[in-house]
Amino acid sequence: MENSNIAVWDNYFTVDSCPEVLNYSYFDHLDIQYLKKKEMYFINLTGMAYTDNLIINTFGHFLNGKTISFEELLKENKLDKNLIELIHLFNPKNKLKITDAENTKIKKILEEWFSPLKNEWYPYLHYLKKRGEK
């Protein structure tokens, strides 16, 4: 039995339960058809202004049917090209070992990309770099 009066509370993006990890994807964890049948959908955001703005922007594109690619969405939001290539590392569905080439790109991002978003993502990028050095 489907109940449309149910509100969905999504903790996918929250960072308080695992402070080393930032989850981010093109809302791959949601079924749009299921979501459309619900009364409300709440996103428990990160508390980081630029990251939350990116998540809300991403959600808007998700609701509109992903009319642009994830890469284009990230470019629109001025993410570093190396970070765009590595964005899959933030999707918890991907349990990947970080390669040497990916770790080199992470180091470049940390050294060369300057953005308010980078300031918020620095601890998560640093954690990925440490994972890649193991």
Predicted regions and their residues:
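C-terminal functional modules
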Residues: 63-134
